[in-house]
């Protein structure tokens, strides 16, 4: 084994040398020598998580630039104060009063100089923006008869008009929040249509950042509102200094941060590599932390635990196979059950995830506070004999679509699709696999012309509340949308989910969520496949690494120790 690893390391060094010869935009040397480089992927990268695709990836950059009203404490349902110092809820559960923090300053950048501190108007603007309608207090941008002589100006205007908030749309936030008003400079009232215990968790998710209303108004006055999403201004521990598209983001310490000042002045977020490329850079000390490493190569770290270490945590995610209920054949429960019994999920975990994931026998990940140890065993686990008996004589030909992009919950989507195809072939089912892009799938769903029987997908949550985990992917309100790819609608499921948010007692909420989960596992609109661990590797000189179940990392706590190797 040692001889094999030495050969691999020799091969790796050759790769490193060849990579160094390739021309590509590079980070200035003085920054890499006087800061920390964090290697991650560029998939789905955006400076505005409000508009990012829901359930795909955690944006570590915006976690450093912006703050939220609340954060989530450890692996619990407890909220910790951020921009909101405290809150109270009315007796009828329909009003939330937020008391905001004083003395918080927005970033001063080449594109914006704030004239005031953070206050209630910023909260009102930020929440109203995702509620949509006419609540944003900004001019409408849907001008259809306006022409622009400058093509770049036209593109910016068109981009600004594409206001979509996938996560908040998926949880129907505009059907939960009736109004948001400032009662004083540091007090905000949120009025709900009905009591909803999940609201504060949603406001603690990665998507619920707080913008500067003053900055947005300035951009609107200049007819340049699109810049709100491309030139960020926040209150976080770091602010943006440079950005090279799909290559790197340079962050510099916010000297006026309201919490303890970050220890490292410069952070480079390298977006330029794939999974194996990140490990190459990591071993070459071109980055001191690498996220989403190639799991098949993680064993290399075990040979040198003096210089490197790995950190992992259970993730709030789920990879699954969805049945398209718009197809009559997929509404046959016996067929769905037999397809589930044909899948060797343990083989997928071993071959694709290299045991950095566990077989998912539930919908709610174990890391959630609502996860129950009393959930019944998954009824439709691998049983190829039963599957073949039920399916062999049906002569089925099924279309399996797979979104052609790597995600936390699915590092090799096409390979998993091929393994599913092979398993189903053993049961006598023919499968045609088709890789599709996310924009193509979105267009097909919009036209209700999606022609798949099965689709491989997954979900990644930004908080530990099952409302933001199960409602987007399984509720009637999201049928025929990008989140609910099964197009399943079950009123009893929705009733369980609604019951869970009408009480503030965690035990009652967990009971309702688990009843909803048991219904899903019986009806089987989706087959759970894997819960994936969040993994990163770090140089032993880097300390203060604390990763959350969502994959986020607070750069402000990172620091170097002085050992030299």
UniProtKB/Swiss-Prot annotation:
Database matches in Pfam families: SBP_bac_5
Chief place of localization: periplasm
Keyword Transport (UniProt): yes
The keyword Nuclease belongs to this UniProt entry's keyword annotation: no
Cellular component terms per the entry's GO annotation: ATP-binding cassette (ABC) transporter complex; outer membrane-bounded periplasmic space
Range of residues in the leader sequence: 1-23
Keywords: Peptide transport, Periplasm, Protein transport, Signal, Transport
GO biological process, alphabetically ordered: peptide transport; protein transport
GO molecular function, a single term: peptide transmembrane transporter activity
Protein localization: Periplasm
Domain of life: Bacteria
Function: Involved in a peptide intake transport system that plays a role in the resistance to antimicrobial peptides.
Family membership noted in the UniProt record: Belongs to the bacterial solute-binding protein 5 family.
Protein name, as recorded: Peptide transport periplasmic protein SapA
Organism: Haemophilus influenzae (strain ATCC 51907 / DSM 11121 / KW20 / Rd)
Lineage: Bacteria, Pseudomonadati, Pseudomonadota, Gammaproteobacteria, Pasteurellales
Gene: sapA
């Amino acid at each position: 084994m040692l001889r094999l690893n030495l050969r691999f390391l020799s091969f790796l060094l050759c790769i490193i040398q060849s990579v160094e010869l390739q021309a590509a935009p590079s980070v200035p040397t003085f920054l890499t020598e006087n800061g920390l480089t964090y290697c991650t992927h560029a998939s789905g990268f955006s400076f505005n998580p409000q508009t990012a695709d829901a359930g795909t990836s955690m944006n570590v950059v915006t976690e450093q630039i912006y703050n939220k009203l609340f954060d989530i404490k450890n692996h619990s349902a407890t909220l910790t104060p951020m921009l909101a110092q405290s809150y109270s809820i009315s007796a009828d559960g329909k009003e939330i009063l937020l008391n905001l923090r004083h003395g918080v300053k927005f970033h001063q950048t080449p594109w914006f100089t704030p004239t005031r501190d953070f206050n209630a108007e910023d909260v009102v603007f930020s929440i109203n923006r995702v509620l949509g309608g006419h609540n944003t207090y900004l001019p409408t941008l849907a001008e259809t008869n306006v022409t622009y002589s400058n093509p770049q100006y036209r593109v910016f205007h068109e981009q600004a008009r594409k206001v979509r908030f996938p996560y908040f749309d998926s949880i129907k936030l505009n059907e939960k929040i009736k109004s948001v008003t400032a009662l004083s400079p540091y007090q905000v009232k949120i009025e709900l249509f009905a009591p909803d215990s999940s609201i504060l968790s949603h406001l603690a998710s990665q998507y619920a950042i707080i913008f500067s209303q003053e900055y947005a108004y300035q951009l609107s006055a200049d007819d340049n509102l699109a810049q709100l999403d491309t030139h960020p201004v926040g209150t976080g521990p770091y602010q943006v200094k440079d950005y090279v598209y799909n290559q790197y983001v340079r962050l510099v310490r916010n000297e006026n941060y309201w919490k303890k000042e970050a220890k490292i002045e410069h952070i480079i977020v390298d977006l330029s590599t794939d999974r194996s490329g990140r490990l190459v850079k990591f071993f070459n000390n071109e980055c001191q932390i690498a996220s989403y490493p190639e799991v098949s190569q993680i064993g290399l770290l075990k040979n040198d635990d003096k210089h490197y270490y790995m950190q992992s945590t259970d993730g709030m995610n789920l990879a699954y196979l969805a049945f398209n209920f718009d197809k009559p054949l997929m509404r046959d429960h016996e067929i769905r059950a037999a397809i589930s019994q044909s899948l060797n999920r343990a083989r997928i975990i071993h071959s694709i995830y290299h045991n950095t994931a566990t077989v998912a026998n539930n919908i709610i990940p174990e890391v959630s506070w609502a996860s129950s140890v009393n959930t019944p065993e998954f009824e439709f686990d691998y049983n190829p004999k039963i599957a073949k008996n039920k399916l062999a004589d049906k002569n089925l030909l099924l279309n399996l679509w797979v979104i052609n992009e790597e995600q936390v919950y699915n590092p090799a989507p096409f390979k998993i699709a091929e393994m599913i195809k092979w398993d189903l072939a053993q049961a006598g089912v023919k499968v045609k696999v088709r890789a599709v892009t996310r924009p193509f799938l979105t267009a097909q769903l919009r036209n209700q012309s999606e022609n798949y029987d099965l689709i491989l997908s997954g979900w990644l949550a930004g908080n530990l509340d099952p409302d933001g985990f199960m409602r987007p992917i399984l509720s009637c309100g999201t049928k025929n949308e990008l989140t609910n790819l099964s197009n399943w609608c079950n009123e009893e499921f929705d009733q369980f989910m609604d019951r869970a948010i009408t009480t503030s007692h965690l035990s009652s909420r967990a009971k309702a969520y688990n009843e909803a989960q048991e219904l899903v596992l019986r009806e089987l609109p989706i087959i759970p496949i894997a819960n994936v661990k969040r993994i990163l590797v770090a140089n032993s000189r880097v300390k203060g690494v604390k990763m959350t179940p969502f994959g986020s990392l607070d750069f402000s706590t990172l620091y170097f120790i002085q050992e030299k190797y």
